[in-house]
Amino acid sequence: MRRFLRLIAFLLGIHVAGLLMLSLFRLVQFGALHSMMAKDGVAPVSTAFVKGVWFDNVIACYVMVVPLAVLLIAACFGCYAKWLRKAAAIWLSVFFILFMGIAAANIPYFAYFFKNLDSSIFGWFGYVGTTTGMLVGEASYWPYIILFFVAALLFALGVRKWYKITDRHISSPQSSLLQKDSGKVGKNPTSLKATAFAFLAKLCVSAALIGLCIFGIRGRMGYNPIKISQAYYCDDPFLNQLGISPTYNLLTSVLDDLRKENAELHLMPYDKAVDYARQSLGITSQIDSTAVLHRHVAADSAAIRPNVVIILMESMSASLMQTFGQSQPLTPTLDSLYRHSLAFTHFYSAGIHTNHGLTATLYSFPALMMRNLMKGTVTPRRSGLPTVLKQEGYHNLFFMTHESQYDNMNAFFRTNGYDEIYSQESYPSSEVANSFGVPDKYLFDYALPVINRAASAGGPFMATLLTISNHPPYIVPQWMKTRTKEPETQIVEYADWCIRQFLAEARQQPWYDNTLFVILADHGKLVGEMDSELPQSYNHIPLIIFGPGIQPALYDGLGTQVDVMPTLLGLMHIGYDYDGFGVDLLRERRQQVFYTSDTQIVARDSASCFIHNPMLGRDFCYDVLPDGRLRQTHDDRRFQPLRQYGFAMVQTAEFMQRHSK
């Protein structure tokens, strides 16, 4: 058994030494680049180093699991072959030295790009001579190159020394399963029992260690495995990125690029698409090579700065409201608000997933079919409503029901304008209802005192609340008295009731009278019949705005989630620089809108709806009837303007997404 334990010590020693060397490179990066830290930051630096070890350990466990399993299982059967340990030492040394090389290269890369190494570096491999000349010719890179070679040499020598030290205690002639570690065969029953017990003990320890290593690869016990978002713990982008393993960052970015949903769209040439999009949005300013839609939106009068509360309701299709033809009284609160607020009749979600709704509503960027624009090894940077309001002195809060890692929300929102993030990790575990976290009522109950605290600080705030209950699995509280019998409709009643309760409690707060409320859905869901290739209920959603100075009115023009930001800032008379796809609906009436699903692109005007499926290469054309229903037509020629509009807008978004990295 001693030999077995020393074998474990041999592997563990290399593992720990590798983590220490990677931490050394992180320390060097901090020392060299600490001036990049936020000037007024108060976050503890030590947390970044702890998270860095955490991510380094994930990568280390990936390379450790094979030699660990092979050596321990062989040892269970009495095999302590020297060549196996040599192979393991070489295997681990090569990989840890590779990781050190990536960590060393990451320091000057981060200094230049303010991001960790990602798959974009492979674009340099096509210019070997130029890249080599840059690395050798730039004197500021030499210290890191020298550091790498010194560290690699020391690590290799250290592993060699450690191998020799442990080898003296492990090496002995190969023995069989029924031999003791001393090499003598026990012939009496007691000796056989002891040998069998030792075998079982080794097997159990091996299974436990291999299991721990696999758990180390997963990185955490939560619903999701570890993701980049886990490194984000404060408002300082330098410290958040310091806690990410450069190797982990590089590998996951490569995997991201290989995902089918991230394949480049080719609907029309980029130059034609951009020209059309700029013309459609009325942009006349000089074009930037990458920020092709950039323009300044001037304020039309003195700015007002009310508080802002945005509620994005999960899957709340307009078809669930009696206002839009629902036969059952599922949403009395929303229907009442619709009649007494600034409400929008023909309003559509950008996509059919939550991440699409968030990106479009808050940052005015449209959905790109199935692609998740909040995720990525390199967290995307976007300007939008949170960043503009933060510049105006707002304190921004985001409340979600589920884990903050979901859809990379923690990293994305901290990077793009939010000061505080509240998620499942913030709530008592006893309140978690399912894999999507806490129910809507608890979300609102938790958020209200936090909002009160933000309001008491004296400055304006923006609070964004993302609900979840109207998403399977539906969990309707037993105490909830509903009018309907099916869980799928009962949960809509519950979601609507939660809005009523929150607004009733908010109405008692001193900040209520100076707050703009925006209520909409993140996307819709299938309700009723399949009325087209992409049923309208998936994207047709309510938009309700009320607050100080907002006169109740019904807006019957077209609009989508990308219009929320410019419309809301227009109501507040705030000027801003803008890269988005939206318009202020109260000052400019849209002639057309576009949106997508995972496999379809939709463009529509008041009379027609065009749907294109790129995978099938097919178009579907519909006339919009007076009652809002669709009737398919095969007169494709009439739909060419809509086709061009939809293709141009989506292709422009594709261009901007690819050039924002």
PLM features: residue spans?
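Transmembrane and membrane-interface helices of multi-pass
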Residues: R2-K260
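Exposed alpha-helical structural elements
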Residues: R3, L7, V45, W83, ...
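Alpha-helix initiation and N-capping motif
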Residues: M21, D118, F125-G129, I244-Y248, ...
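Residues that form generic nucleotide/phosphate-binding pockets
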Residues: G52, D56, A104, M134, ...
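Glycine-centered secondary-structure boundary/capping sites
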Residues: G78, K82, F114, Y141-W142, ...
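Short alpha-helical "patches" and their helix-cap loops
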Residues: W83, E261-K272, M374-V378, F581-V583
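The feature marks either
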Residues: Y127, S176, D236, G243-Y248, ...
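Solvent-exposed soluble domains appended to multi-pass membrane proteins
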Residues: S280-K661
